[in-house]
Amino acid sequence: MSLKPRVVDFDETWNKLLTTIKAVVMLEYVERATWNDRFSDIYALCVAYPEPLGERLYAETKIFLESHVRHLYKRVLESEEQVLVMYHRYWEEYSKGADYMDCLYRYLNTQYIKKNKLTEADIQYGYGGVDMNEPLMEIGELALDMWRKLMVEPLQNILIRMLLREIKNDRGGEDPNQKVIHGVINSFVHVEQYKKKFPLKFYQGIFVSPFLTETGEYYKQEASNLLQESNCSQYMEKVLGRLKDEEIRCRKYLHPSSYTKVIHECQQRMVADHLQFLHSECHSIIQQERKNDMANMYVLLRAVSSGLPHMIEELQKHIHDEGLRATSNLTQEHMPTLFVESVLEVHGKFVQLINTVLNGDQHFMSALDKALTSVVNYREPKSVCKAPELLAKYCDNLLKKSAKGMTENEVEDKLTSFITVFKYIDDKDVFQKFYARMLAKRLIHGLSMSMDSEEAMINKLKQACGYEFTSKLHRMYTDMSVSADLNNKFNNFIRNQDTVIDLGISFQIYVLQAGAWPLTQAPSSTFAIPQELEKSVQMFELFYSQHFSGRKLTWLHYLCTGEVKMNYLGKPYVAMVTTYQMAVLLAFNNSETVSYKELQDSTQMNEKELTKTIKSLLDVKMINHDSEKEDIDAESSFSLNMSFSSKRTKFKITTSMQKDTPQELEQTRSAVDEDRKMYLQAAIVRIMKARKVLRHNALIQEVISQSRARFNPSISMIKKCIEVLIDKQYIERSQASADEYSYVA
């Protein structure tokens, strides 16, 4: 074919073209040669001489399409009950034919229509150069537009009514023609799919809106029927079944954009409209832990707004009640272990339930945390919360040498699990005080099962609460290794003296930082060191002063222990004793009988401490009370028990020093209160320094927020701290408002 423009007879060329496009649009056979000739004819018309005939070709093609669609419309109308089937048949034929026509008219589309086509801006803001009423469209688009205007819109009511009826029959169990229904609905999408903006607007307006209304009505009635014939479990099962069926139905018939809208409408009618009924059954389902019902209820309630909160609240109450039942009435002897293991058991049970039944939903995990927080921090009216102390004792039991039958790995696993419970404590500072006191006893008295386990536990607490929380614990741990090094240096110091020095005893010492250890430096009694120990103490003080100038050593004799060999019996016994007990026993080196007054003079101990020490030796029958009176007084005298015997050749004499006393517990809690006051005062100063001016309520909220990681401060305590800082002139009340504070620089 020649590409050169030439004179063309439009009527003759159009008649040939018309015959071909009639065949094309009806999917009749067209020979390849004919197709090529018609393609050339369209080109010739578009480049015709003296003037192109593209505009006339477009107009005639449009007239043909209008005529053809009107003809098909009449035939569909005449089919009566077969409207959907006939519509679908003609649509399938017409839409494919329109695609072929669009290919045939490719040159017209690209060279004439696209060049003269209005842009979206032209349509929106107006453009005088082209007739605004009839914007040009590519031939494929024009064909679809004709179908929409001349077929779909006139048949709209009939088509929609029939489609809704067929889908309703499908819901009722009948088996309608899926291909026809899907094809008809898809035609509503296809006729405007070429549009760049809102291509689904026509489909949504003509079909989706009435379909959603019909769906809502249908499932409203369906829910009403189901409620009359079912209990809650059955209702949930059936509703889930209906939702699944409707989802399959959506995929069979509708455009993907409609799936969620339809399912949402079903959920509104069958779930949201009956929330009160579902919520009323929620309590018994959770109380009885009916897992299948819980899973079904979760799936249903999750899908509607304000559906889940009630279920979350019910589960939280249930976990709280079960937790309290598990942790109450525990035997006193094993309370720390039973308490922690009971909480872990409840935690493990409900974590598994939430993961397997409730899809691991974080809202329920948060409810679990809140419930167990209230369980762990529960306290009887007018009593303190026992959890911090119990948890500290639990760790103490695990980390002591007396934790029999457990390997280090088993202890490690238990301590890792323990952190789960620890995180629920509000008063972490109370735990820290008890833990530090128990750690001190383990370290000083050599009771730790393993120093590696001690360090691992401190690191776990550090990960949970930060460096500041464990800084003192770290220093205590470090002091032990530093002391071991110090002992080696001291032994070298003794060996390297010019004159040979015999201390007379093997001697080990711990040098502890006063600020890190929870130890009272004020002894409960005065004390004179036994002569046998004096030399070693003096030499260590000399060594220490030479190595660390400016440091002051304070001897904590009440914490010291030693071993005493008993050479006066048939068996070679060794007694592990406190320094106070040692001082009393060493008095018997010079005499088998010693009076109370002599002991008082030699030890310089006060009456209370001396009496307690003597009593501990009487209890194990190492000495005898040479008096008919039971009570110890100034006239008492004591003698060595020469017939003493024990199953063990090495034994320990326990004292109240190693046991927890009510006074110690009270001291610990008092120390916590003092620390809290200082912490709150520091927090208030920090906040006010940054903010300069702050209202009362805002300051209190800031302080609570900053303190929550360590403890939950009471508002009354915060107020007292504010008053203290006003007295100390760190802050002042604002002159403008009594409800406002200013930072004093």
Curated annotation (Swiss-Prot):
Q: Which GO terms of the molecular function aspect are on file? A: protein-containing complex binding; ubiquitin ligase complex scaffold activity; ubiquitin protein ligase binding
Instruction: Classify the source by domain of life.
Output: Eukaryota
Pathway stated in the Swiss-Prot or TrEMBL entry? Protein modification; protein ubiquitination
Position of the Glycyl lysine isopeptide (Lys-Gly) (interchain with G-Cter in NEDD8) cross-link: 689
Q: How is it modified after translation?
A: Neddylated; which enhances the ubiquitination activity of ECS (Elongin BC-CUL2/5-SOCS-box protein) E3 ubiquitin-protein ligase complexes. Neddylation leads to structural rearrangment in the complex that allows interaction between the E2 ubiquitin-conjugating enzyme and the acceptor ubiquitin. CBC(VHL) complex formation seems to promote neddylation. Deneddylated via its interaction with the COP9 signalosome (CSN) complex.
Which cellular component, as a GO term, is one annotated location? VCB complex
Sites of Phosphothreonine modification: 661
Could you tell me the Gene Ontology terms of the biological process aspect for this record?
protein catabolic process; protein ubiquitination; ubiquitin-dependent protein catabolic process via the C-end degron rule pathway
Record-linked SMART domains: CULLIN, Cullin_Nedd8
Q: Which residues form the Cullin neddylation domain?
A: 675-735
Please name every pair of cysteines joined by a disulfide bond in this record.
Answer: none
User: Keywords, A to Z?
Assistant: Acetylation, Isopeptide bond, Nucleus, Phosphoprotein, Ubl conjugation, Ubl conjugation pathway
Where is the protein localized? Answer: Nucleus
Cross-referenced Pfam families: Cullin, Cullin_Nedd8
TM segment ranges: none
- Residues that the record marks as modified (N6-acetyllysine) are 393
Domains: entry comment: The Cullin neddylation domain restrains the RING domain of RBX1 in the E3 ubiquitin-protein ligase complex; this restraint is removed upon neddylation of the cullin.
Q: How does it assemble?
A: Component of multiple Cul2-RING (CRL2) E3 ubiquitin-protein ligase complexes consisting of CUL2, Elongin BC (ELOB and ELOC), RBX1 and a variable substrate-specific adapter; this complex is also known as ECS (Elongin BC-CUL2/5-SOCS-box protein) complex and may consist of CUL2 or CUL5. Component of the ECS(VHL) or CBC(VHL) complex containing CUL2, RBX1, ELOB, ELOC and VHL. Component of the ECS(MED8) complex with the probable substrate recognition component MED8.
Q: Which family does it belong to?
A: Belongs to the cullin family.
Name of this chain's protein:
Cullin-2
Organism from which the protein derives: Mus musculus
